[in-house]
């Protein structure tokens, strides 16, 4: 059980430090082409590998460039994490694009379209919050 808590603690620290490095430490211009948010961090039980899930707000071409920049900076990031977290061996860092926010926005758009169609047909009165959660 202590192993699980340690992994969670390391993941939280990696998320915090990576966020700071995205703002102040990484100089690659590709990384700053879109708004980058770290959505989650998964660390292997042996602390040798970690996956950093990022959400990138911007055009698809910009998203690809940002991902290339992040991958290029992963070696620098690994060294900085090792230094800042005082780990003997910092985990190998991999970035993965998290499309959860895009999917959520898409679902909300579909729900809004459905509500508009139902209002046009007179099934629900305008301004009704029938589709809104309680």
From Swiss-Prot:
GO terms for molecular function: ribosomal small subunit binding. Residues 115-134 are annotated as: Disordered. Pfam families: RBFA. Disulfide bonds: none annotated. Keywords: Cytoplasm, Ribosome biogenesis. The keyword Transmembrane helix does not apply. The keyword Cytoplasm applies. Its main location: cytoplasm. One of its GO terms (cellular component) is cytosol. GO terms for biological process: maturation of SSU-rRNA. It is found in: Cytoplasm. One of several proteins that assist in the late maturation steps of the functional core of the 30S ribosomal subunit. Associates with free 30S ribosomal subunits (but not with 30S subunits that are part of 70S ribosomes or polysomes). Required for efficient processing of 16S rRNA. May interact with the 5'-terminal helix region of 16S rRNA. PANTHER family: RIBOSOME-BINDING FACTOR A, CHLOROPLASTIC-RELATED. Monomer. Binds 30S ribosomal subunits, but not 50S ribosomal subunits or 70S ribosomes. Belongs to the RbfA family. This is Ribosome-binding factor A. It comes from Synechococcus sp. (strain CC9902). The gene is rbfA.
